[in-house]
C-alpha cells in the first residue's frame, strides 16, 4: 500500500491531505488497508463515489470550501462557516484511524482545512499551523491570494 501513502502528506500521525481522485485516482481498498478510516472532501466531491466509500466502511463527509483564486467577496464567510464542521469531522474520526482531507490539487483548500485543524485542535498559532502544512506540502497556499487569505481566515477562526 506504499503507493497509496506516497500521495498523502501527514500533518499528524493520523491526519493527512491529498489531491482529489479527479486529479490522481485513488485505490480505496488500499487506503483502507493502510489504516485510512475517514475521507473528507472540501471541494465539490468530483469523482468521489460515495456509495463505494460507504460500502467499504469509510466515514465520509462533503464540506466545501471556497475555490476562488483570486479570492472573491463572500469567500471569507464561506470558509469561516465551514471550518468548524471540518475540524469536528477530523476530531470525531482521527481516533478510529487515519483521516484524509482532499480538494482537487490538495494544496489550498486542503491546506486551509489542515491548518485550521492544527490551530483549533492542536493549539498551533496561525503562522505555525501554516508552516506545518507547508513543511509537508510545499505548494500549499500557492494559488493567487491564498497566502494572505488563509492567514486572514485562520486569524478569524482563532477569534471564535
Region annotations inferred by a language model:
Residues 1-100, 105, 112-160:
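Cys-dependent protein tyrosine phosphatase-like superfamily
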